Amino acid sequence: MEHRGVTVWLTGLSGAGKTTITKALEQELRSRNCEKLEVLDGDIVRQNLTKGLGFSKEDRDTNIRRIGFVANLLTRNGVMVLVSAISPYREVREEVGRQIGNFVEVFVNAPLNVCEERDVKGLYKRARAGEIEKFTGIDDPYEPPTNPTVECRTDLESLDESVGKVLGKLEELGYISN
């Protein structure tokens, strides 16, 4: 499938469903023969590209800017990039979106209590116990997008519905064909 380069940036709290939606999107796009496709997962990026950064606001912003830099390079070379990263601060997300241009912001929205119930990594429990400082949603803010391109309410809709919303928007914007 031929398509224009675009970055699809999934943002939301830990446990909201970003990685789950990203993996399902990747699978669906590959089944449609989308060959120029890359995934930048925040957890994997932190182990490689941004290793050594902490969780201060400055370090988080640096992390997002670096992910954005790589996504921009890929996007301008015709690659569809799926980014899955908490990216808690609105200002730096908007900055990265402006730099990339072909940017689809997907707000993966689930209430904090739902994310805590899902807590597959045990991070919320550790944050509540004081073992993790500056944890997004607990003692560090998450600033939701003011006008996301797509909002997926993962507490109210199925995975297929969320993926369908994103694919539908990519089709509507001309990034993929149906």
PLM segments and residue spans:
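ATP-dependent NMP and nucleoside kinases share a basic, alpha-helical "lid"
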Residues: 48, 52-54, 71-127, 134
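Small-molecule kinase domains that catalyze NTP-dependent phosphoryl transfer to phosphate-bearing small molecules
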Residues: 109-112, 117-165, 173-178
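Conserved beta-strand scaffold positions in the cores of enzyme catalytic domains, especially
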Residues: 39, 103-105, 149-151
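Conserved lysine of the Walker
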Residues: 18
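The conserved Walker
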Residues: 14
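Hydrophobic anchor at the beta1->P-loop junction of P-loop NTPases
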Residues: 10
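Phosphate-binding P-loop
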Residues: 1-5
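Conserved substrate/cofactor phosphate-moiety recognition/catalytic segment
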Residues: 23-69
